[in-house]
Amino acid sequence: MDLFAIILLFLPHCAVLTEIPYNWLNLAVLRASDYQPRTDHWRGRQVYEALCKRLQGLTPHQQALCQQHPAAIPFVAKGVREALLQCQQQFQFDRWNCSSRDEVTEGPHGPFQDILGRTFRSTTREAAYLAAISSASIVHSITKGCTTGNLTECGCDSKPNLQRYAIEEDILGGQRRQRANIEQFSWGGCSDNVPYGVKFARKFLDEWEQEQFNKTKDVSHLVRKHNHFVGREAIAQNVRKQCRCHGVSGSCEFRTCWLQMPKFVEVAEMLKKRYEHFAVQVTKRAKKRLRRKDRAERGTPLRGNEMAYVQRSPSYCERNDTIGILGTSGRECKHGSYESDSCDLLCCGRGFNTRIETRTQQCHCKFVWCCEVKCEQCIEDVAVHTCK
């Protein structure tokens, strides 16, 4: 049996049809992300198309794109799962830690989990980050599938000279060094096909948002579309040109170069900095493009590194099931810290409880030639602080 035929077993039919919201983040919890596509199977495309019809939370545009590129959907699912993991990693010490109380409803093809749904459909700064990193995750995952050959409808970039790149590095004797000058080189190896990933992500996310804005004039669609662009640009603007030197005794007489996108954890970190320092509040109304709320800068278009939001964020201090906020009660904090993980900030002035836990940790680590680090296991009593 084809692996994707197995997925259908996890999407049982339901007698009662329930209208479910559009939220493609639901792909993160489907078994589709666990499997590699098998395009060599004669029934492969039929199985994928049947799966597309039963995936819940996709917009009509996403359903159509799934039908056209069914083998790409597992990579989208893997990408959004990685996006959510990185989101939780980047915000683990913030009041909003990229988690929420998700509603589970019975849809036409089984239970539907509305992952971060209220945040996903809002226009806060947190929603901006979520839109940006999920968009970037599609670009990264699809591009990686092209480069590795696991996604057969694309391959390496045949015209890397048309891509932008920010950093140039040489690989020489296993070492990497950033170059300060430009020398002759030839394109070789397998350059990451970022343009293909960007194009797919734009189709998957933006076409429906633009169509809905044209119909409803709801600015939230333009906000999400812009933040999707910010996520894509975080990858496209940070592609690296990497080169391998050839010559006698590493003289680097000639170089072979290729383009490589940044690691996804680097993208997540870049987007977190843009969330913290380059988030711009925009007006609630727009004709064709977003406008800054600050009247003095209203004529300045939003840049590709600026996230857009409309609503001010709630405090996230207290639990509020109505809007899906978990609150910070019970969260572990650091006493004496001056960062966002400090007990003063994370506990919102409510104070904290302290308990002593016995933990096993690595200690007395030593470097052993060559090339290993050996550590002992130490049992320590640790003071753990949690918010009241």
Q: What residue ranges belong to the model's regions?
A:
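Long, position-biased, composition-driven segments near the start of the mature protein
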Residues: 2, 15-345, 349-388
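Classical eukaryotic N-terminal signal peptides for Sec-dependent ER targeting/secretion
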Residues: 1-11
